[in-house]
Amino acid sequence: IEDGTEIVSRSVIFATGISRRKLGVPGEKELFGKGVSYCAVCDCNFYKGRKVLIVGNDSEAAVSAELMTRYASETFWAAWDVEADPKLVAKAKDAGAKLLTSKPKEIRGEGKVQSVLMDDGSVVEVDGVFIELGAKSAADLAMDLDIMPEIDDTIKVNPDCSTKVPGAFACGDITGRPWQVAKAVGQGCIAGMAAVDYVRGKK
């Protein structure tokens, strides 16, 4: 580990989770939890009857935009380089999401989100901003054990949460979607029990 300590183990469980990709604009960090969110599925209920902006170019963002039309009074979707499935884009627009082709430049607000400055100079007044730019995992650590991350930066596991390397298990968000606590808890239990069985079998 970082302090130089070496730990010897017969088994290891990767439960490093993921980190949501940030937009990297002023106001994002300061207003996180005060109108800035990285999960529309998690926080949609908090924005009933309010105005929101979805930020992202892929299918995840399209799905989130369509979802928020069921809750928000007005849903804007900023997608400046659309990569989403055209069918999902159409579904979001048909549901009422207003597609903006400019990129957010600054998230503004005093104590809470109030508006977003776009790179074309326009200002969108909203109560919430959902940044849906995907996520990255801590899979670099797993590469040292030759557990190659999948193309989507996840670790492939079997039903017992084992990986292709004997004795190495993975659970939670690092194994892919859905990124939900319930899944992480369940897989954590499975991985823990499987690791115990593996170690016992090696004695």
Predicted regions, residues:
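FAD-site-proximal beta/loop scaffold in flavoenzymes
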Residues: 19, 24, 30-46, 133-178, ...
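Rossmann-like NAD(P)H-binding beta-loop-alpha module
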Residues: 50-71
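Cofactor-binding loop segments of dinucleotide-utilizing enzymes, especially the Rossmann-like FAD-
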Residues: 41, 57, 80-82, 173
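A Rossmann-like FAD-binding core segment of flavoenzymes
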Residues: 1, 6-8, 70-157, 200-203
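N-terminal Rossmann-like NAD(P) cofactor-binding module of classical short-chain dehydrogenase/reductase
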Residues: 13-14, 130
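Nucleotide donor/acceptor-binding cores
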Residues: 10-11, 34, 49-52
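A conserved FAD-binding loop/helix module that cradles the flavin
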Residues: 62-65, 171-203
